[in-house]
């Protein structure tokens, strides 16, 4: 139950059942974690077909209920990793409002849709919108491939930082 690294550790959750998520968060309570991260970004078909990860982006009302419960249960930081939408951005503004209503502490935003996977061009304008709209820091994710691209994209979007995915392994 000790964290020997002296570095913050987050537990990432994926799921749609509120009671299961509540039980999991309570199971984490005795451990020295810095916070809970809700994954709303996974684009894997075997995941989103179960209406979890990026699949939940089709249901902003359900996300609101999950985040309300998490905000109530989590005394540490509550963060969210999400994409700009499932097949398009029709719920994007509503999702940003959900982030504000539930007082999320950090939003990591992948600038593509779930169905866009890793093939489509990232929409960095959505990151700019999120930075202006939410009351928490926003990390940009999507095609951050180097220090140079990270710096350029942070300047372009005003994001507070970047989250590096696949390129972290390649580099």
Regions found by a protein language model. Give the residues of each.
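Flavin-dependent oxidoreductase catalytic cores
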Residues: 1-171
């Amino acid at each position: 139950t000790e964290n020997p690294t002296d570095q913050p550790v987050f537990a990432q959750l994926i799921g749609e059942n509120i009671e299961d998520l509540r039980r999991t968060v309570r199971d984490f309570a005795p451990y020295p974690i810095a916070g809970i991260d809700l994954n709303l970004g996974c684009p894997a078909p075997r995941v989103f077909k179960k209406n979890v990860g990026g699949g939940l982006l089709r249901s902003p009302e359900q996300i609101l209920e999950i985040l309300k419960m998490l905000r109530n249960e989590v005394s540490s930081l509550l963060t969210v990793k999400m994409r700009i939408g499932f097949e398009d951005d029709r719920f994007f503004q509503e999702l940003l409002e959900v982030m504000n209503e539930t007082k999320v502490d950090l939003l990591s935003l992948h600038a593509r849709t779930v169905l866009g996977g890793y093939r489509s061009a990232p929409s960095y304008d959505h990151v700019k919108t999120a930075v202006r709209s939410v009351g928490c820091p926003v990390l940009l994710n999507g095609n951050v491939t180097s220090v140079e691209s990270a710096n350029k994209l942070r300047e372009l979007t005003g994001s507070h930082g970047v989250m590096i995915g696949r390129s972290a392994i390649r580099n």
